[in-house]
């Protein structure tokens, strides 16, 4: 400072480089369907509409997965990623992964409530590749992505217009070849 005082602290940092953090978890779940059923039993009930169940799935994945930029497993199959990630969440309450982890868990749980899903990939955007879903709960296709966004954007059942408004703010996560996918309804989703 201006009086000549100084403080010195010694700090040690340890950096661990890893491509994936996959750890096979011993669990009583032998199939993806079994762990999906267990999670859905925890977060939904029969009194809920399909939209309410989808919202519970969104909140579950959004809060139980932390973004690291690396998938949880080395597998390129979403079913493998979802199975391993969900087992870890059931055991530890949390798992780290990337958009592939979020989309895989979203897809498995949405399939479990009977929703239709289409996988969407954003290839080559400035922010890097990104994956999310188009989801149809019976009222048309909407964008569904529980990935935590730096901007705080919540992508629960968004229309194409809502996604475009997000893109117009300078965000690139959802750039895609629009003609490859079904159009969403023009009205925001309600449940």
Segments (PLM) and residue ranges:
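Low-complexity, Pro/Ser/Thr- and charge-rich linker/hinge segments at domain boundaries
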Residues: 17-27
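Secondary-structure boundary elements
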Residues: 26-92, 186-189
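Conserved active-site-adjacent core of cysteine acyl-enzyme catalytic domains
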Residues: 74-113, 121
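Hydrophobic/aromatic-rich core segments of domains that either
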Residues: 101-166
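Low-complexity, Gly/Ser/Thr/Pro-rich intrinsically disordered linker/tail segments
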Residues: 156-191
